[in-house]
Structure formats: structure tokens, C-alpha cells
């Protein structure tokens, strides 16, 4: 455990950031899975789920959780599944 006050604060801040990042990544994956599940089931609200998944990917990229190439790849694959 850190002894210096600033190091203690960094540990606390890093834990909060890690929890926030994990939550955001989970939300992105969940949005993509919801879209895929709805696509297989032939749901009516496919447009809304597609937009939500794209938005989640963009948000994760803007926060630096995923790199630009992964965001583009995920969006491209999602769009291909949406078009089928």
C-alpha cells in the first residue's frame, strides 16, 4: 500500500477510472449483443438498437477505451450484419 498522500489519491482515482471504464466497455458489448440477438429474433426495433450500438462504439472510442481501428472495424461489421 502506498504511504505518500498523493500516491494514495492516485490509487483511489485509478480504481474509480477502472470501474468507469469497465462499465463503459460492458455497456458497449451489451449494446452489440442486444442488436445481434434482436436481429436473429427478427425484432421490430432493429433501427434503434443499431443506432444505440453505433453510439456505444463511438462513445467508447471518444473516451479512449478502444482504438480508432477497432471502432471502425466493429462499426463496419455491425453495419454488414444490419444490412443482411
Swiss-Prot record:
Record flagged with keyword Lipid biosynthesis: no
GO cellular component terms attached to this protein's record: cytosol; small ribosomal subunit
Molecular function (Gene Ontology), one example: small ribosomal subunit rRNA binding
InterPro entries noted in UniProt: Ribosomal_bS20, Ribosomal_bS20_sf
Keywords recorded for this protein, A-Z: Ribonucleoprotein, Ribosomal protein, RNA-binding, rRNA-binding
Any GO BP annotation: translation
Signal peptide: none
NCBIfam families linked: S20
Summary of the function given for this chain in its UniProt record: Binds directly to 16S ribosomal RNA.
Family: Belongs to the bacterial ribosomal protein bS20 family.
Name of the featured protein: Small ribosomal subunit protein bS20
Species of the source: Limosilactobacillus fermentum (strain NBRC 3956 / LMG 18251)
